[in-house]
Amino acid sequence: MNLNATFFAQMVVFFILWWVVAKFIWPPLVKALDERAKKIADGLAAAEKGKAELELANKRVDQAMAEARTEGAQRVADAEKRAQLTADEIKQNAQAEAARIIAQAKAEAEQQATRAREALRDQVAVLAVKGAEQILKREVNAQVHADLLNQLKAEL
């Protein structure tokens, strides 16, 4: 191998270039690459965090929807129960009112029947007295007696 001055000059230039690159170019380049790697890592971490938050939010939404469905079903059941109770109460009130009206009608019918019996008794008593008067006014014989009884029957 031939070692001459050119070779040594090239080595000196190479080391100077290496020193300049190592001193002025390499640190900013490494810094830029590190910053880029950090931004990428931060972006991936933010994406993972966002994904986890999205899953958590979806779980909360699903839970809230389930609670809303349960609450809605409970409200519907309560409303149906109240409606049934109200319907039963209305039915009982209607039955009680019907029983009251029937009892009142029976009482009125009995009162009318009692009044009719009393009126009939009064009329029968009056007729009996009239019949007795007529019998006593006339002479008592069988033919007159039969005629008076027939007349009383006709009046009744």
Swiss-Prot record:
Keyword Cell division found: no
Gene Ontology cellular-component annotations: plasma membrane; proton-transporting ATP synthase complex
Family matches, as InterPro entries: ATP_synth_B-like_membr_sf, ATP_synth_b/b'su_bac/chlpt, ATP_synth_F0_bsu_bac, ATP_synthase_B_chain
Subcellular location as annotated: Cell inner membrane
TM annotation in the entry: 7-27
A single GO molecular function term of this UniProt record: proton-transporting ATP synthase activity, rotational mechanism
Top-rank lineage group of the source organism: Bacteria
Keywords recorded for this protein, A-Z: ATP synthesis, Cell inner membrane, Cell membrane, CF(0), Hydrogen ion transport, Ion transport, Membrane, Transmembrane, Transmembrane helix, Transport
Record membrane topology: Single-pass membrane protein
Transmembrane helix as UniProt keyword: yes
Major localisation: membrane
NCBIfam families: ATP_synt_b, PRK05759.1-2
Subunit structure: F-type ATPases have 2 components, F(1) - the catalytic core - and F(0) - the membrane proton channel. F(1) has five subunits: alpha(3), beta(3), gamma(1), delta(1), epsilon(1). F(0) has three main subunits: a(1), b(2) and c(10-14). The alpha and beta chains form an alternating ring which encloses part of the gamma chain. F(1) is attached to F(0) by a central stalk formed by the gamma and epsilon chains, while a peripheral stalk is formed by the delta and b chains.
Protein task: F(1)F(0) ATP synthase produces ATP from ADP in the presence of a proton or sodium gradient. F-type ATPases consist of two structural domains, F(1) containing the extramembraneous catalytic core and F(0) containing the membrane proton channel, linked together by a central stalk and a peripheral stalk. During catalysis, ATP synthesis in the catalytic domain of F(1) is coupled via a rotary mechanism of the central stalk subunits to proton translocation.
Family assignment from sequence similarity: Belongs to the ATPase B chain family.
PANTHER family in the record: ATP SYNTHASE SUBUNIT B (PTHR33445:SF1), ATP SYNTHASE SUBUNIT B', CHLOROPLASTIC (PTHR33445)
Protein name per Swiss-Prot or TrEMBL: ATP synthase subunit b
Organism of provenance: Cupriavidus taiwanensis (strain DSM 17343 / BCRC 17206 / CCUG 44338 / CIP 107171 / LMG 19424 / R1)
Lineage, broadest ranks: Bacteria, Pseudomonadati, Pseudomonadota, Betaproteobacteria, Burkholderiales
Gene that specifies this protein: atpF
